[in-house]
Amino acid sequence: MSSSDIFDVLNIKQKSSSPNAASPSVPASGKSSKPQLTGMQRELYNLLGENEAPVVVQSMNRFKEKLASNAKPTPWSLANFKANEYLTLQHWVKGSRELIGEEPQESEFKKYDVHLTIPEFTEDEYNSFIPTSNAEENEKQNIGEKVEANGDSTDVNMTEEDTNDKVKESVPQDENKSTSDNKKNNEKWEYNEVKYLFDLCKKYDLRWFVIQDRYDYENSNRTLEDLKSKFYEVSKCYFKAKKPDDPMLQSLNYSKDKETQRKKYLERLLARSAAEIAEEEALIIESRKFEMAAKKTLAERETLLRLLDSPQSDISVAQYLTSNGMSQLYNSLLADKSRKRKIDSAVPENPWMKQQHQFAQQRQQMQQLQQKKLEKHDASATPGPATTVTATETSTNVTSAGSIPSGLQSPKKTKRQKLELQTALKRKSESEYAEQLLKIFNMDERKSLGVIAHGEKLSPGVFLRSAKITTFKPAIQNKIISTAQELGIPARPVMPTFEVVTEYEALLKKIATLLDIKKQIDKIEAGKQITK
Protein backbone atom coordinates (compact mmCIF):
# COMPACT_ATOMS: atom_id res chain seq x y z
CA MET A 1 0.00 0.00 0.00
CA SER A 2 1.45 3.37 -1.05
CA SER A 3 0.88 6.89 0.27
CA SER A 4 -1.53 7.77 -2.56
CA ASP A 5 -3.80 4.89 -1.56
CA ILE A 6 -3.90 6.17 2.02
CA PHE A 7 -4.73 9.69 0.79
CA ASP A 8 -7.61 8.28 -1.27
CA VAL A 9 -8.99 6.40 1.73
CA LEU A 10 -8.84 9.51 3.91
CA ASN A 11 -10.25 11.80 1.14
CA ILE A 12 -7.17 14.02 1.19
CA LYS A 13 -6.23 15.87 -1.94
CA GLN A 14 -2.63 15.81 -2.97
CA LYS A 15 -0.78 19.07 -3.60
CA SER A 16 0.26 18.22 -7.11
CA SER A 17 -2.72 18.13 -9.48
CA SER A 18 -0.94 15.96 -12.01
CA PRO A 19 1.41 13.62 -10.17
CA ASN A 20 2.38 11.75 -13.31
CA ALA A 21 3.35 14.92 -15.22
CA ALA A 22 7.00 14.85 -14.23
CA SER A 23 8.83 11.68 -15.18
CA PRO A 24 10.87 10.03 -12.46
CA SER A 25 13.85 9.65 -14.76
CA VAL A 26 14.32 13.43 -15.24
CA PRO A 27 14.86 15.13 -11.88
CA ALA A 28 14.00 18.75 -11.29
CA SER A 29 16.80 21.22 -11.63
CA GLY A 30 15.98 23.20 -8.49
CA LYS A 31 15.38 20.27 -6.16
CA SER A 32 18.26 18.19 -4.74
CA SER A 33 18.00 14.41 -4.80
CA LYS A 34 17.26 12.79 -1.45
CA PRO A 35 19.94 10.47 -0.10
CA GLN A 36 19.12 6.80 -0.05
CA LEU A 37 18.34 5.79 3.53
CA THR A 38 19.24 2.46 5.03
CA GLY A 39 18.05 0.74 8.14
CA MET A 40 14.31 1.12 7.33
CA GLN A 41 12.02 -0.96 5.14
CA ARG A 42 10.83 0.62 1.87
CA GLU A 43 7.11 0.18 2.62
CA LEU A 44 7.50 1.85 6.00
CA TYR A 45 9.44 4.70 4.44
CA ASN A 46 6.75 5.23 1.78
CA LEU A 47 4.11 5.65 4.50
CA LEU A 48 5.85 8.83 5.65
CA GLY A 49 4.94 10.63 2.42
CA GLU A 50 6.46 14.06 2.03
CA ASN A 51 7.19 14.36 5.75
CA GLU A 52 10.81 13.82 6.71
CA ALA A 53 11.78 10.94 8.98
CA PRO A 54 12.44 12.11 12.57
CA VAL A 55 15.52 9.97 13.30
CA VAL A 56 16.99 7.32 11.07
CA VAL A 57 19.63 5.04 12.49
CA GLN A 58 22.31 4.39 9.89
CA SER A 59 25.00 1.85 10.53
CA MET A 60 28.37 3.48 9.93
CA ASN A 61 31.16 0.94 10.05
CA ARG A 62 34.35 2.76 10.92
CA PHE A 63 37.78 1.61 11.97
CA LYS A 64 39.85 3.26 14.65
CA GLU A 65 41.69 6.30 13.44
CA LYS A 66 45.35 5.85 12.88
CA LEU A 67 47.54 7.27 15.62
CA ALA A 68 49.43 10.20 14.28
CA SER A 69 52.83 10.20 15.99
CA ASN A 70 56.21 11.28 14.75
CA ALA A 71 58.12 9.11 17.30
CA LYS A 72 60.51 6.51 16.03
CA PRO A 73 59.41 2.89 16.79
CA THR A 74 61.58 1.11 19.37
CA PRO A 75 63.33 -2.00 18.16
CA TRP A 76 62.75 -5.46 19.67
CA SER A 77 65.32 -8.20 19.41
CA LEU A 78 65.30 -11.93 20.14
CA ALA A 79 67.86 -12.54 22.93
CA ASN A 80 69.05 -15.55 24.88
CA PHE A 81 68.52 -15.92 28.65
CA LYS A 82 69.41 -18.55 31.26
CA ALA A 83 66.43 -20.25 32.85
CA ASN A 84 68.82 -22.20 35.09
CA GLU A 85 72.35 -23.55 34.98
CA TYR A 86 71.51 -26.21 32.42
CA LEU A 87 68.83 -24.59 30.24
CA THR A 88 69.07 -21.59 27.88
CA LEU A 89 65.97 -20.13 26.19
CA GLN A 90 65.08 -17.16 23.98
CA HIS A 91 62.63 -14.30 24.40
CA TRP A 92 61.90 -10.90 22.88
CA VAL A 93 63.59 -7.98 24.62
CA LYS A 94 63.01 -4.28 24.07
CA GLY A 95 66.15 -2.77 22.58
CA SER A 96 68.63 -3.27 19.82
CA ARG A 97 71.12 -6.13 19.55
CA GLU A 98 74.08 -3.82 20.25
CA LEU A 99 72.61 -2.68 23.58
CA ILE A 100 71.69 -6.19 24.77
CA GLY A 101 74.83 -8.01 23.73
CA GLU A 102 75.37 -11.52 22.57
CA GLU A 103 75.96 -13.18 25.98
CA PRO A 104 72.83 -14.75 27.55
CA GLN A 105 71.44 -12.71 30.44
CA GLU A 106 69.80 -13.90 33.63
CA SER A 107 66.03 -14.07 33.69
CA GLU A 108 64.08 -11.27 35.36
CA PHE A 109 61.95 -13.87 37.12
CA LYS A 110 64.89 -15.55 38.82
CA LYS A 111 64.22 -13.57 42.01
CA TYR A 112 60.91 -15.42 42.34
CA ASP A 113 62.60 -18.83 42.08
CA VAL A 114 63.05 -19.27 45.86
CA HIS A 115 63.94 -22.61 47.44
CA LEU A 116 63.97 -23.83 51.04
CA THR A 117 67.23 -23.78 52.98
CA ILE A 118 67.96 -27.45 53.64
CA PRO A 119 70.98 -28.16 55.89
CA GLU A 120 74.06 -29.54 54.16
CA PHE A 121 76.81 -31.48 55.96
CA THR A 122 79.69 -33.81 55.28
CA GLU A 123 80.15 -37.34 56.56
CA ASP A 124 82.51 -36.20 59.35
CA GLU A 125 80.01 -33.60 60.56
CA TYR A 126 77.22 -36.16 60.40
CA ASN A 127 79.22 -38.61 62.53
CA SER A 128 80.08 -35.81 64.96
CA PHE A 129 76.58 -34.61 65.87
CA ILE A 130 74.64 -37.89 65.47
CA PRO A 131 76.53 -39.91 68.18
CA THR A 132 76.02 -37.09 70.69
CA SER A 133 72.26 -37.28 70.25
CA ASN A 134 72.35 -41.08 70.51
CA ALA A 135 74.38 -40.83 73.73
CA GLU A 136 71.79 -38.46 75.25
CA GLU A 137 68.98 -40.86 74.37
CA ASN A 138 70.92 -43.77 75.92
CA GLU A 139 71.42 -41.75 79.12
CA LYS A 140 67.68 -41.05 79.30
CA GLN A 141 66.92 -44.74 78.81
CA ASN A 142 69.41 -45.71 81.54
CA ILE A 143 67.83 -43.21 83.95
CA GLY A 144 64.39 -44.64 83.19
CA GLU A 145 65.64 -48.19 83.78
CA LYS A 146 67.17 -47.14 87.12
CA VAL A 147 63.91 -45.55 88.22
CA GLU A 148 62.02 -48.71 87.27
CA ALA A 149 64.57 -50.84 89.18
CA ASN A 150 64.17 -48.66 92.29
CA GLY A 151 60.41 -48.92 91.99
CA ASP A 152 60.63 -52.70 91.73
CA SER A 153 62.91 -52.90 94.79
CA THR A 154 60.46 -50.90 96.92
CA ASP A 155 57.60 -53.25 96.05
CA VAL A 156 59.21 -56.42 97.45
CA ASN A 157 56.54 -57.00 100.10
CA MET A 158 53.73 -57.95 97.72
CA THR A 159 51.38 -60.88 97.70
CA GLU A 160 51.72 -63.77 95.27
CA GLU A 161 48.61 -62.77 93.34
CA ASP A 162 49.95 -59.26 92.76
CA THR A 163 53.29 -60.63 91.56
CA ASN A 164 51.57 -63.02 89.15
CA ASP A 165 49.45 -60.19 87.76
CA LYS A 166 52.51 -57.99 87.28
CA VAL A 167 54.38 -60.79 85.55
CA LYS A 168 51.42 -61.25 83.18
CA GLU A 169 51.37 -57.53 82.46
CA SER A 170 55.13 -57.31 81.97
CA VAL A 171 55.21 -60.11 79.37
CA PRO A 172 53.39 -58.14 76.64
CA GLN A 173 55.38 -55.04 77.55
CA ASP A 174 58.64 -56.96 77.06
CA GLU A 175 57.32 -58.30 73.78
CA ASN A 176 56.48 -54.76 72.66
CA LYS A 177 59.93 -53.57 73.71
CA SER A 178 61.60 -56.37 71.79
CA THR A 179 59.56 -55.62 68.67
CA SER A 180 60.39 -51.92 68.95
CA ASP A 181 64.11 -52.74 69.38
CA ASN A 182 63.97 -54.96 66.30
CA LYS A 183 62.33 -52.18 64.36
CA LYS A 184 65.02 -49.75 65.46
CA ASN A 185 67.76 -52.16 64.38
CA ASN A 186 66.05 -52.69 61.02
CA GLU A 187 65.68 -48.94 60.55
CA LYS A 188 69.40 -48.15 60.63
CA TRP A 189 70.31 -45.27 58.38
CA GLU A 190 73.70 -44.75 56.77
CA TYR A 191 75.21 -41.44 55.73
CA ASN A 192 74.72 -42.07 52.01
CA GLU A 193 71.01 -42.78 52.47
CA VAL A 194 70.57 -39.68 54.66
CA LYS A 195 72.41 -37.59 52.06
CA TYR A 196 70.16 -39.04 49.33
CA LEU A 197 67.07 -38.13 51.39
CA PHE A 198 68.26 -34.54 51.96
CA ASP A 199 69.05 -34.11 48.27
CA LEU A 200 65.51 -35.18 47.37
CA CYS A 201 64.08 -32.79 49.98
CA LYS A 202 66.10 -29.93 48.52
CA LYS A 203 65.14 -30.83 44.95
CA TYR A 204 61.39 -31.11 45.58
CA ASP A 205 61.05 -28.46 48.35
CA LEU A 206 59.78 -30.86 51.03
CA ARG A 207 56.85 -32.09 48.96
CA TRP A 208 56.69 -35.34 50.85
CA PHE A 209 54.39 -37.28 48.56
CA VAL A 210 56.66 -36.51 45.59
CA ILE A 211 59.74 -37.40 47.66
CA GLN A 212 58.22 -40.75 48.65
CA ASP A 213 57.32 -41.45 45.03
CA ARG A 214 60.87 -40.65 43.79
CA TYR A 215 62.62 -42.35 46.72
CA ASP A 216 64.51 -45.40 45.44
CA TYR A 217 67.61 -46.20 47.46
CA GLU A 218 68.81 -49.81 47.15
CA ASN A 219 65.21 -51.09 47.15
CA SER A 220 64.57 -49.92 50.73
CA ASN A 221 60.90 -49.89 51.75
CA ARG A 222 60.63 -46.64 53.66
CA THR A 223 57.24 -45.22 54.54
CA LEU A 224 56.39 -41.54 54.45
CA GLU A 225 56.51 -41.36 58.26
CA ASP A 226 60.00 -42.94 58.28
CA LEU A 227 61.31 -40.34 55.86
CA LYS A 228 59.75 -37.47 57.80
CA SER A 229 60.97 -38.67 61.20
CA LYS A 230 64.55 -39.17 59.95
CA PHE A 231 64.65 -35.80 58.22
CA TYR A 232 63.41 -33.89 61.29
CA GLU A 233 65.61 -35.92 63.65
CA VAL A 234 68.81 -35.20 61.69
CA SER A 235 67.85 -31.53 61.20
CA LYS A 236 67.26 -31.12 64.92
CA CYS A 237 70.63 -32.71 65.77
CA TYR A 238 72.35 -30.51 63.17
CA PHE A 239 70.91 -27.23 64.51
CA LYS A 240 71.34 -28.35 68.12
CA ALA A 241 75.06 -28.95 67.54
CA LYS A 242 75.39 -25.45 66.05
CA LYS A 243 73.20 -23.55 68.51
CA PRO A 244 71.88 -25.56 71.48
CA ASP A 245 69.82 -22.66 72.96
CA ASP A 246 67.85 -21.98 69.79
CA PRO A 247 64.11 -21.65 70.65
CA MET A 248 63.16 -22.84 67.15
CA LEU A 249 64.33 -26.38 67.94
CA GLN A 250 60.89 -27.19 69.35
CA SER A 251 59.38 -26.70 65.88
CA LEU A 252 61.43 -29.67 64.59
CA ASN A 253 59.72 -32.18 66.88
CA TYR A 254 57.92 -34.91 64.94
CA SER A 255 56.00 -37.81 66.50
CA LYS A 256 55.89 -40.76 64.15
CA ASP A 257 53.48 -42.77 66.34
CA LYS A 258 50.96 -39.93 66.52
CA GLU A 259 51.06 -39.46 62.75
CA THR A 260 50.46 -43.16 62.05
CA GLN A 261 47.66 -43.23 64.63
CA ARG A 262 46.07 -40.15 63.05
CA LYS A 263 46.13 -41.78 59.61
CA LYS A 264 44.61 -44.96 60.99
CA TYR A 265 41.80 -42.94 62.56
CA LEU A 266 41.26 -41.12 59.27
CA GLU A 267 41.16 -44.37 57.29
CA ARG A 268 38.68 -45.81 59.78
CA LEU A 269 36.57 -42.67 59.47
CA LEU A 270 36.54 -42.79 55.67
CA ALA A 271 35.82 -46.53 55.63
CA ARG A 272 32.46 -46.15 57.39
CA SER A 273 29.38 -47.60 55.78
CA ALA A 274 26.21 -45.64 54.99
CA ALA A 275 24.39 -47.26 57.93
CA GLU A 276 27.12 -46.20 60.36
CA ILE A 277 27.07 -42.63 59.03
CA ALA A 278 23.27 -42.49 59.40
CA GLU A 279 23.52 -43.85 62.94
CA GLU A 280 26.13 -41.23 63.86
CA GLU A 281 23.98 -38.45 62.42
CA ALA A 282 20.99 -39.72 64.43
CA LEU A 283 23.13 -39.77 67.58
CA ILE A 284 24.34 -36.22 66.90
CA ILE A 285 20.74 -35.04 66.47
CA GLU A 286 19.73 -36.75 69.72
CA SER A 287 22.69 -35.23 71.56
CA ARG A 288 21.72 -31.77 70.30
CA LYS A 289 18.17 -32.36 71.51
CA PHE A 290 19.51 -33.31 74.94
CA GLU A 291 21.69 -30.20 74.98
CA MET A 292 18.71 -28.00 74.11
CA ALA A 293 16.59 -29.68 76.79
CA ALA A 294 19.40 -29.25 79.33
CA LYS A 295 19.74 -25.55 78.47
CA LYS A 296 15.98 -25.10 78.78
CA THR A 297 15.86 -26.84 82.17
CA LEU A 298 18.82 -24.76 83.39
CA ALA A 299 17.08 -21.55 82.32
CA GLU A 300 13.84 -22.61 84.03
CA ARG A 301 15.77 -23.58 87.16
CA GLU A 302 17.46 -20.19 87.22
CA THR A 303 14.11 -18.41 86.89
CA LEU A 304 12.71 -20.58 89.69
CA LEU A 305 15.67 -19.79 91.94
CA ARG A 306 15.28 -16.10 91.16
CA LEU A 307 11.59 -16.35 91.98
CA LEU A 308 12.29 -18.06 95.29
CA ASP A 309 15.11 -15.67 96.23
CA SER A 310 13.43 -12.44 95.13
CA PRO A 311 11.51 -10.51 97.83
CA GLN A 312 7.72 -10.41 97.64
CA SER A 313 6.20 -7.10 96.56
CA ASP A 314 4.21 -5.25 99.25
CA ILE A 315 2.96 -2.40 97.03
CA SER A 316 -0.68 -1.55 97.64
CA VAL A 317 -3.19 -1.54 94.76
CA ALA A 318 -5.37 1.21 96.22
CA GLN A 319 -3.50 4.00 94.42
CA TYR A 320 -4.58 2.52 91.05
CA LEU A 321 -8.31 2.27 91.93
CA THR A 322 -9.09 5.89 91.04
CA SER A 323 -9.24 7.33 87.52
CA ASN A 324 -6.17 9.51 88.12
CA GLY A 325 -4.17 6.49 89.30
CA MET A 326 -5.28 4.42 86.31
CA SER A 327 -4.17 7.15 83.89
CA GLN A 328 -0.79 7.39 85.63
CA LEU A 329 -0.40 3.59 85.43
CA TYR A 330 -1.32 3.62 81.71
CA ASN A 331 1.21 6.38 80.96
CA SER A 332 3.96 4.60 82.90
CA LEU A 333 3.26 1.33 81.05
CA LEU A 334 3.43 3.11 77.68
CA ALA A 335 6.72 4.77 78.63
CA ASP A 336 8.09 1.43 79.83
CA LYS A 337 7.06 -0.24 76.57
CA SER A 338 8.69 2.43 74.38
CA ARG A 339 11.95 2.35 76.34
CA LYS A 340 14.66 0.12 74.87
CA ARG A 341 15.53 -2.89 76.96
CA LYS A 342 19.11 -3.66 77.80
CA ILE A 343 20.09 -7.29 77.43
CA ASP A 344 21.10 -8.60 80.80
CA SER A 345 24.18 -10.60 79.85
CA ALA A 346 25.44 -10.94 83.39
CA VAL A 347 26.00 -14.43 84.71
CA PRO A 348 23.31 -15.44 87.23
CA GLU A 349 24.45 -15.65 90.82
CA ASN A 350 25.15 -19.13 92.13
CA PRO A 351 22.98 -19.74 95.23
CA TRP A 352 25.44 -22.26 96.66
CA MET A 353 28.34 -19.79 96.49
CA LYS A 354 26.11 -17.16 98.06
CA GLN A 355 25.26 -19.54 100.88
CA GLN A 356 28.95 -20.31 101.41
CA HIS A 357 29.73 -16.58 101.62
CA GLN A 358 26.96 -16.17 104.19
CA PHE A 359 28.33 -19.08 106.22
CA ALA A 360 31.81 -17.54 106.09
CA GLN A 361 30.42 -14.20 107.27
CA GLN A 362 28.57 -15.85 110.15
CA ARG A 363 31.70 -17.78 111.12
CA GLN A 364 33.76 -14.57 111.18
CA GLN A 365 31.14 -12.79 113.26
CA MET A 366 31.07 -15.68 115.74
CA GLN A 367 34.87 -15.61 116.00
CA GLN A 368 34.86 -11.85 116.58
CA LEU A 369 32.19 -12.20 119.29
CA GLN A 370 34.19 -14.94 121.00
CA GLN A 371 37.35 -12.82 120.88
CA LYS A 372 35.48 -9.86 122.37
CA LYS A 373 34.11 -12.06 125.16
CA LEU A 374 37.58 -13.39 125.95
CA GLU A 375 39.02 -9.86 125.96
CA LYS A 376 36.27 -8.68 128.33
CA HIS A 377 36.91 -11.65 130.60
CA ASP A 378 40.66 -10.94 130.62
CA ALA A 379 40.04 -7.25 131.28
CA SER A 380 37.78 -8.03 134.24
CA ALA A 381 40.31 -10.55 135.61
CA THR A 382 43.38 -8.24 135.32
CA PRO A 383 42.41 -4.59 136.02
CA GLY A 384 44.84 -1.68 135.71
CA PRO A 385 47.50 -1.55 133.06
CA ALA A 386 46.24 -4.72 131.41
CA THR A 387 43.30 -2.76 130.03
CA THR A 388 45.63 -0.95 127.63
CA VAL A 389 46.89 -4.30 126.39
CA THR A 390 43.35 -5.52 125.74
CA ALA A 391 42.56 -2.30 123.93
CA THR A 392 45.55 -2.76 121.65
CA GLU A 393 44.56 -6.39 121.07
CA THR A 394 41.03 -5.39 120.16
CA SER A 395 42.37 -2.80 117.73
CA THR A 396 44.60 -5.43 116.12
CA ASN A 397 41.66 -7.84 115.93
CA VAL A 398 39.54 -5.15 114.30
CA THR A 399 42.26 -4.40 111.78
CA SER A 400 42.72 -8.10 111.05
CA ALA A 401 38.99 -8.47 110.61
CA GLY A 402 39.04 -5.49 108.27
CA SER A 403 41.73 -7.13 106.16
CA ILE A 404 39.37 -9.97 105.23
CA PRO A 405 38.71 -10.07 101.50
CA SER A 406 35.67 -8.19 100.33
CA GLY A 407 34.34 -11.31 98.57
CA LEU A 408 34.00 -13.07 101.97
CA GLN A 409 32.71 -10.02 103.90
CA SER A 410 29.75 -9.17 101.72
CA PRO A 411 28.85 -10.37 98.25
CA LYS A 412 28.26 -7.78 95.53
CA LYS A 413 24.68 -6.53 95.42
CA THR A 414 22.71 -5.45 92.40
CA LYS A 415 20.92 -2.10 92.08
CA ARG A 416 17.58 -3.71 92.80
CA GLN A 417 18.87 -5.30 96.01
CA LYS A 418 20.38 -1.98 97.12
CA LEU A 419 17.08 -0.15 96.51
CA GLU A 420 15.16 -2.83 98.40
CA LEU A 421 17.63 -2.56 101.27
CA GLN A 422 17.21 1.24 101.35
CA THR A 423 13.41 1.01 101.35
CA ALA A 424 13.51 -1.64 104.09
CA LEU A 425 15.78 0.57 106.24
CA LYS A 426 13.48 3.55 105.62
CA ARG A 427 10.41 1.56 106.65
CA LYS A 428 12.23 0.27 109.68
CA SER A 429 13.15 3.81 110.76
CA GLU A 430 9.56 4.99 110.21
CA SER A 431 8.17 2.05 112.18
CA GLU A 432 10.66 2.72 115.00
CA TYR A 433 9.51 6.35 115.08
CA ALA A 434 5.87 5.21 115.23
CA GLU A 435 6.74 2.78 118.02
CA GLN A 436 8.31 5.63 119.96
CA LEU A 437 5.05 7.55 119.65
CA LEU A 438 2.95 4.54 120.76
CA LYS A 439 5.03 3.70 123.84
CA ILE A 440 2.24 4.84 126.15
CA PHE A 441 -0.11 2.10 124.88
CA ASN A 442 0.10 -1.55 125.97
CA MET A 443 -0.40 -4.44 123.55
CA ASP A 444 -3.91 -5.08 124.90
CA GLU A 445 -4.83 -1.42 124.53
CA ARG A 446 -3.49 -1.40 120.99
CA LYS A 447 -5.58 -4.44 120.07
CA SER A 448 -8.72 -3.08 121.66
CA LEU A 449 -8.33 0.42 120.20
CA GLY A 450 -7.00 -0.81 116.82
CA VAL A 451 -3.87 1.35 116.96
CA ILE A 452 -1.19 0.07 114.54
CA ALA A 453 2.27 1.43 113.67
CA HIS A 454 2.48 1.29 109.87
CA GLY A 455 5.94 1.02 108.34
CA GLU A 456 4.79 2.17 104.89
CA LYS A 457 3.07 5.30 103.65
CA LEU A 458 -0.72 4.94 103.56
CA SER A 459 -2.90 6.26 100.76
CA PRO A 460 -5.24 9.12 101.75
CA GLY A 461 -8.95 8.58 102.16
CA VAL A 462 -11.11 5.77 103.50
CA PHE A 463 -10.59 2.27 102.13
CA LEU A 464 -11.44 -1.33 102.98
CA ARG A 465 -8.76 -3.66 104.27
CA SER A 466 -9.98 -6.43 101.97
CA ALA A 467 -9.38 -4.15 98.94
CA LYS A 468 -5.66 -4.08 99.80
CA ILE A 469 -5.20 -7.84 99.45
CA THR A 470 -2.56 -8.50 96.78
CA THR A 471 -3.81 -9.92 93.49
CA PHE A 472 -1.97 -12.01 90.89
CA LYS A 473 -2.23 -12.61 87.16
CA PRO A 474 -5.64 -13.92 86.00
CA ALA A 475 -4.43 -17.47 85.30
CA ILE A 476 -2.55 -17.72 88.61
CA GLN A 477 -5.42 -16.01 90.47
CA ASN A 478 -7.90 -18.63 89.22
CA LYS A 479 -5.60 -21.46 90.30
CA ILE A 480 -5.12 -19.88 93.74
CA ILE A 481 -8.90 -19.46 94.20
CA SER A 482 -9.53 -23.09 93.14
CA THR A 483 -6.90 -24.42 95.59
CA ALA A 484 -8.31 -22.21 98.36
CA GLN A 485 -11.81 -23.55 97.69
CA GLU A 486 -10.46 -27.11 97.85
CA LEU A 487 -8.99 -26.28 101.26
CA GLY A 488 -12.28 -24.70 102.36
CA ILE A 489 -10.96 -21.12 102.48
CA PRO A 490 -13.24 -18.36 101.09
CA ALA A 491 -12.10 -15.99 98.34
CA ARG A 492 -12.42 -13.04 100.76
CA PRO A 493 -11.94 -13.18 104.54
CA VAL A 494 -15.16 -12.94 106.53
CA MET A 495 -13.70 -10.72 109.27
CA PRO A 496 -10.91 -8.73 107.56
CA THR A 497 -9.06 -7.52 110.63
CA PHE A 498 -5.41 -6.45 110.36
CA GLU A 499 -4.06 -9.79 111.61
CA VAL A 500 -6.48 -11.82 109.46
CA VAL A 501 -5.57 -9.84 106.31
CA THR A 502 -1.80 -10.21 106.90
CA GLU A 503 -2.13 -13.96 107.48
CA TYR A 504 -4.42 -14.29 104.45
CA GLU A 505 -1.89 -12.48 102.21
CA ALA A 506 0.93 -14.70 103.48
CA LEU A 507 -1.21 -17.77 102.75
CA LEU A 508 -1.94 -16.59 99.18
CA LYS A 509 1.77 -15.98 98.53
CA LYS A 510 2.66 -19.44 99.82
CA ILE A 511 -0.02 -21.02 97.59
CA ALA A 512 1.38 -19.13 94.56
CA THR A 513 4.95 -20.30 95.26
CA LEU A 514 3.78 -23.89 95.77
CA LEU A 515 1.87 -23.82 92.47
CA ASP A 516 4.96 -22.53 90.67
CA ILE A 517 7.13 -25.24 92.28
CA LYS A 518 4.58 -27.88 91.25
CA LYS A 519 4.70 -26.60 87.67
CA GLN A 520 8.49 -26.82 87.58
CA ILE A 521 8.46 -30.33 89.11
CA ASP A 522 5.97 -31.50 86.47
CA LYS A 523 8.25 -30.15 83.74
CA ILE A 524 11.30 -31.91 85.21
CA GLU A 525 9.41 -35.21 85.49
CA ALA A 526 8.21 -34.88 81.89
CA GLY A 527 11.80 -34.28 80.80
CA LYS A 528 12.95 -37.36 82.71
CA GLN A 529 10.29 -39.48 81.02
CA ILE A 530 11.38 -38.16 77.62
CA THR A 531 15.02 -39.04 78.35
CA LYS A 532 13.99 -42.56 79.45
UniProtKB/Swiss-Prot annotation:
Pfam families for this protein: SANT_DAMP1_like
Any one biological process term the GO annotation gives: chromatin remodeling
Location in the cell: Nucleus
A single MF term (Gene Ontology): transcription corepressor activity
A GO cellular component annotation in the UniProt record: NuA4 histone acetyltransferase complex
Polar residues: compositionally biased ranges: 30-39, 402-411
Key words of the record: Activator, Chromatin regulator, DNA damage, DNA repair, Nucleus, Transcription, Transcription regulation
Skewed-composition ranges (Basic and acidic residues): 137-149, 164-184
Compositionally skewed regions (Low complexity) per UniProt: 16-29, 380-401
Segments of this protein annotated with the region Disordered: 13-39, 132-184, 363-417
Residue ranges occupied by any SANT domain in the UniProt entry: 181-235
Summary of subunit composition and partner proteins: Component of the SWR1 chromatin-remodeling complex and of the NuA4 histone acetyltransferase complex.
Family to which the UniProt record says this protein belongs: Belongs to the SWC4 family.
Function: Component of the SWR1 complex which mediates the ATP-dependent exchange of histone H2A for the H2A variant HZT1 leading to transcriptional regulation of selected genes by chromatin remodeling. Component of the NuA4 histone acetyltransferase complex which is involved in transcriptional activation of selected genes principally by acetylation of nucleosomal histone H4 and H2A. The NuA4 complex is also involved in DNA repair.
Protein's UniProt name: SWR1-complex protein 4
Species of provenance: Candida glabrata (strain ATCC 2001 / BCRC 20586 / JCM 3761 / NBRC 0622 / NRRL Y-65 / CBS 138) (Yeast)
